[in-house]
Amino acid sequence: MICHNQQSSQPPTIKTCPGETNCYKKQWRDHRGTIIERGCGCPSVKKGVGIYCCKTDKCNR
């Protein structure tokens, strides 16, 4: 699996994730504004954090 792993508005970067079957994109708001985090897997999140998990290479853009 190949997933994007940059945060918020940083330039796109990718990571190869051996053994993973998902990529994720998490989004939440704090005093800095909207924060976006991308990576491998499909983590559980706290209330108030949006999560999108997908199963194809680079699908978490």
UniProtKB/Swiss-Prot annotation:
Disulfide bonds join 3-23, 17-40, 42-53, 54-59. CDD domains: TFP_snake_toxin (cd00206). Keywords: Acetylcholine receptor inhibiting toxin, Disulfide bond, Ion channel impairing toxin, Neurotoxin, Postsynaptic neurotoxin, Secreted, Toxin. Expressed by the venom gland. It is found in: Secreted. InterPro entries: Snake_3FTx (IPR003571), Snake_toxin-like_sf (IPR045860), Snake_toxin_con_site (IPR018354), Toxin_cobra-type (IPR054131). The keyword Cell inner membrane does not apply. GO terms for cellular component: extracellular region. One of its GO terms (molecular function) is acetylcholine receptor inhibitor activity. Gene3D superfamilies: CD59. The keyword Secreted applies. Pfam families: Toxin_cobra-type. Binds to muscle nicotinic acetylcholine receptor (nAChR) and inhibit acetylcholine from binding to the receptor, thereby impairing neuromuscular transmission. Belongs to the three-finger toxin family. Short-chain subfamily. Type I alpha-neurotoxin sub-subfamily. This is Short neurotoxin 2. It comes from Naja haje haje (Egyptian cobra).
